[in-house]
Design a protein with these regions (language model features):
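Motif I (Walker A/P-loop) of helicase-class P-loop NTPases
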Residues: 1-6
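Conserved strand-helix element at the start of the C-terminal RecA-like helicase core
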Residues: 9, 14-29, 158, 162, ...
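Conserved nucleic-acid-binding Ia/Ib motif block in the N-terminal RecA-like helicase ATPase lobe
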Residues: 14-16, 20-64, 202
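Loop/turn-to-beta-strand initiation segments
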Residues: 14-15, 41, 55-59, 73-76, ...
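Conserved helicase ATPase core of P-loop NTP-dependent helicases/translocases
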Residues: 41-56, 202-230
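Post-DEXD/H (motif II) to motif III coupling segment of the RecA-like Helicase ATP-binding lobe
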Residues: 72-150, 160-163
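Conserved RecA-like helicase motor core of SF1/SF2 enzymes
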Residues: 81-86, 209, 216, 220-225, ...
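Conserved segment of the helicase C-terminal RecA-like domain
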Residues: 101-117, 263-294
Length: 305
């Protein structure tokens, strides 16, 4: 979707920055863009990249924190995952972004889940928006299935297997990969133990995991069948053929945007465009209801195209 704009900017010898809040996304985008634009001077900037980065390439792929390096530098500034943490919550990062662009720069903001502020700007015609309700492969977004688990929190506290998760395992193709989202770091190990007892090949991952990159790579290469994760993998990573299960979907950490993003991890491949999304909960929340409505609404708009 961005390639035409980047291609045009490169053709006119303009400087481009594709910024995103998360280092994982920078690491994923850089090789893809390098393959598409092999003759363009390009650099990836994120925390821990070392002192050998000059930051002077024509095309910069960077975390939004790295924009502090620049002032009046870019003719085209693209902010991916506009609503993601930490960019969404930090006014200083917004200032860095504005300062990094030239006065008459073109700015493109990308998000699948605009926040109320962006929605108001769009509705009042203060922010031009193009709505893309369908994926590149033309198939609808997977609609989450909601499953009530009575005594969910009690079972979690007692490290007991959930009936809904057991039913999922019984019906699930054991060769098929899936992601298990839990609301807190503290739940990673208990659920890992429960699933290891079922003989599953798995790993856990969270934001401060020093082996996060290696585990994600192993999962992408099919060496791990199940990845148990916090919301760190709710966005910005692409796995071709997976299903998704969310534990305690009514937890505060799973707001409407998070649920939509997590559901969006499934069905990303044209060879496997459906995917299963299961939300295990102790009671429906407004976030769950609105997320399902939003996904169905997007699918309806996609059908109309």
């Amino acid at each position: 979707m961005l390639y035409p704009a980047i291609t045009e900017a490169i053709r006119h010898n303009k400087r481009i920055c594709l910024a995103t809040p998360r280092a994982d996304v920078v690491q994923e985008l850089y090789p893809r863009l390098k393959e598409v634009f092999p003759n363009t001077e390009m650099e990836a900037l994120y925390g821990g990249t070392g002192g050998d980065r000059t930051g002077v390439g024509q095309l910069i792929i960077a975390t939004t924190h790295q924009l502090i390096r620049y002032q009046n530098a870019f003719d085209l500034l693209i902010i991916d995952e506009l609503d993601a943490f930490p960019f969404h919550h930090d006014p200083l990062l917004h200032q860095f972004a504005v300062r990094s662009a030239k006065k008459y720069a073109t700015k493109i903001y990308l998000t699948a889940t605009p926040r109320p502020k962006q929605k108001r700007l769009i509705e009042s015609n203060k922010l031009k928006a193009i709505f893309v309700p369908i994926r590149f492969h033309g198939y609808p977004l997977p609609v989450p299935r909601l499953r009530l688990e009575l005594g969910l929190k009690r079972k979690i506290s007692q490290n007991k297997m959930l009936h809904s998760l057991e039913a999922f395992l019984d019906s699930h193709d054991p060769k098929r990969q899936w992601l298990l989202f839990v609301p807190t770091i503290q739940l990673l190990t208990p659920f890992a133990k429960l699933l290891e007892e079922k003989g599953l090949d798995l790993a856990t991952v969270h934001a401060d995991d020093p082996k996060r990159k290696e585990k994600i790579t192993a999962y992408r290469e099919g060496k791990i069948n199940v990845l148990i994760t916090t919301t760190i993998l709710e966005r910005g990573v692409t796995f071709p053929s997976i299903d998704v299960v969310m534990i305690d979907a009514g937890h505060d950490v799973f707001d409407e945007a998070a649920i939509v993003q997590i559901a969006g991890r499934a069905g990303r491949s044209p060879k496997d465009p459906t995917g299963d999304v299961l939300l295990i909960h102790q009671g429906k929340t407004e976030a769950m209801i609105q997320a399902v409505k939003q996904i169905k609404r997007m699918n309806q708009k996609g059908k109309a195209l």
